[in-house]
């Protein structure tokens, strides 16, 4: 079956546009109808395993509460941490109990912010985002106040033989300091599609851990992370991807006025016939910005790791200090690692 046919069949299987993301759903579906799925001619997807990507769309998106993997056991939460577990079709995000210092964003705040960060990255034919927009029905939109003094965990488990789409927006207020941990858990023959937008106001210090663990047999994940940094903010991302049959991670960080610090430390580990790809974009829209990026990959057996790291430093971003390093370890003759740094 042709990719365009698979895409149309998937779009036709989706429920009607509805809820707070109705407008976003229409945008995503129109993009996919116009552009279709990517091909080897698209540079950003050139190395993609398209059989895996097409199977991503073969799973149904509608699930019942009985589908939820209820036997998951999580470590006991630390007294200085707050944990949110997102279970599609089981817990309405508006009814989640929030700790002191975190509140739901208002409707006007959402109107002003939702989608602006990911749109500002200016990615042409943004298929990853379009897939999420088309199929996300709930939005976890939180404002972190400067008086919040705990760590925050957001855990998203998969559902066997289902495709789930989640959307998260975090607005971190001026002067706040936050330790954030996100955990994505795969399941057999399952798929996840995540879109995360984070807006850091001035003088925010955010340490962001992202652990993405698949379950090998038919588990896949596409995750887009879009971060907007205001001046004098600090953002540190440490991520791990392991165990996915197919995974694609797209971190995009924009320093809107420069004068900010970004640290990225990513590790992806593959075995068997897995393919895990990281496509990062960091752009400086002002002077005196700093970046320290380290990408590590370990590939064994017949697996494939991909890294494409784009750094955009326009003329207005004077005195930018940007460092990017890629370190790779191949453990078998059949394994493959492709790394491509880009400075524009």
Task: Walk through the language-model features, giving the residues of each.
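N-terminal leader/transition segments
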Residues: 1-166, 173-175, 184, 330-344
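Conserved beta-strand/loop scaffold segments within soluble protein domains that form the structured core
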Residues: 112-344
